[in-house]
Amino acid sequence: MLWTEETMRQVTGRSSKNSTIKASIRLASGGRFFSASMVENVAEEGDIVVTIDTPRATLVTAQILSELSAETILAINGQNLLSSEVAVVSDAIDNKLAVIALDKKAHDLLVEKFSERLHFTSPLLSTTHSDKNAFIIETADSSTYYLRLYNNGLQLAEALDLASEDELLYYVANILDIAATDIPIYINSEEKKVIRLLKKYYKVICE
């Protein structure tokens, strides 16, 4: 979700440097699983951008982050940090930053290995199709969803943990109501069941 300083309501998205290494880490079970094996195989030079796949994330503007701590932002978003978690913040893209709940052990391992080379990001910050009016649905697994609505700019972004098909259809229908116009729906998912479900009710473009 994107929080705007004007409304403080949940609404809701970095340019890569040269020699930047990008890695994607899926933190299953709500962000509490981390495999350290990949860390030892990463090159010793260049920035490290780690994408954290977890629904325990939200978007804010730089202004909001200057007024509230990352921990407070997650708490207000209904994502109180567990004792085993820390809050991390991404670099900014178009004045938007991701605030993410991350397992402490994973965080400490990454910081110890990469220190100032380390940058975090979230799929919520993806800019795919940001140049058009579109609704984008991405999945990390069968229950972790990233929903982004572009309607004359980023209007809404959600990182969600959905337990059922009905929940997914509820959110999709509500976001399309927010759009209040016909827009293309793009889906990026390896979950064939999800694709079949959405195709049953909507015209979707698979990527």
Where are these regions (language model features)?
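Hydrophobic/aromatic-enriched cytosolic interaction surfaces used to assemble or bind macromolecules
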Residues: 1-207
